[in-house]
Amino acid sequence: MKLFLDTANIQEIKEAWSLGIIDGVTTNPTHISKENKKFRELIEEICSIVDGPISVEAVSLKAEEIVREAEELSKISPNIVVKIPAIKEGIKAAKILSEKGIKTNITLVFSPSQALLAGKVGATYVSPFVGRLNDISEEGINLVADIKKIYSNYGFKTQIIVSAIRNPMHVVKAALIGADVATMRFDILMSLFRHPMTDLGLEQFLKDWEKVPK
């Protein structure tokens, strides 16, 4: 399973990329707004760091405008993937962009039917938001399993990016289901390294090593 970092923060991206464990980056307008940098310059900087898919969101709501925006975004780098909301105009735009060879990521997906439509129009990625479903007392990871089954049934090539991840267990469950990608905040990515028993074991080993004659 591939791991993407869900941020637009350059320092976080540099650190995560240097570890050799991430394969791409996902951004959204909220991430971008926090960085206090010009939009295009920020995206270009991210592309200069990460040699992998970089999801950038189109903010238009009409299909024709989404297509125009996507065409401009795709000129920044061949690694750009255009995020498009799972609405009627977005699905319409994704079909056009797929035919033009522009990579797309259908985002804000909360139902199997939305994911089915993304697969039908040939979207490159689909992003089910598991954590937000959990926030309203639904089991978000079940949506991922449903999408995986639908795509398997019909041979859709659209890749599943498990999004809105709230904790490391979401990542593990996504991997067990067979999702293609999990995208997560920097702090959650860092938490994948940690287990208290690892810390205790390492502490004991180091103490014992000090007893070894040098």
Swiss-Prot record:
Any Pfam family: TAL_FSA
Gene3D superfamilies: Aldolase class I (3.20.20.70)
E.C. number: 2.2.1.2
Protein name (record): Probable transaldolase
Gene that encodes the chain: tal
Entry's Gene Ontology molecular function annotations: aldehyde-lyase activity; transaldolase activity
Keyword entries, A-Z: Cytoplasm, Pentose shunt, Schiff base, Transferase
Class of this enzyme: transferase
Chief localization: cytoplasm
Alphabetical list of PANTHER family matching this protein: FRUCTOSE-6-PHOSPHATE ALDOLASE 1-RELATED, TRANSALDOLASE
Top-rank lineage group of the source organism: Bacteria
Pathway(s) the chain acts in: Carbohydrate degradation; pentose phosphate pathway; D-glyceraldehyde 3-phosphate and beta-D-fructose 6-phosphate from D-ribose 5-phosphate and D-xylulose 5-phosphate (non-oxidative stage): step 2/3
Homology family: Belongs to the transaldolase family. Type 3B subfamily.
Originating species: Dictyoglomus turgidum (strain DSM 6724 / Z-1310)
Record-annotated active site: K83
Catalytic activity: D-sedoheptulose 7-phosphate + D-glyceraldehyde 3-phosphate = D-erythrose 4-phosphate + beta-D-fructose 6-phosphate
Its biological purpose: Transaldolase is important for the balance of metabolites in the pentose-phosphate pathway.
Subcellular location: Cytoplasm
Cross-referenced HAMAP family: Transaldolase_3b
GO cellular component term, pick one: cytoplasm
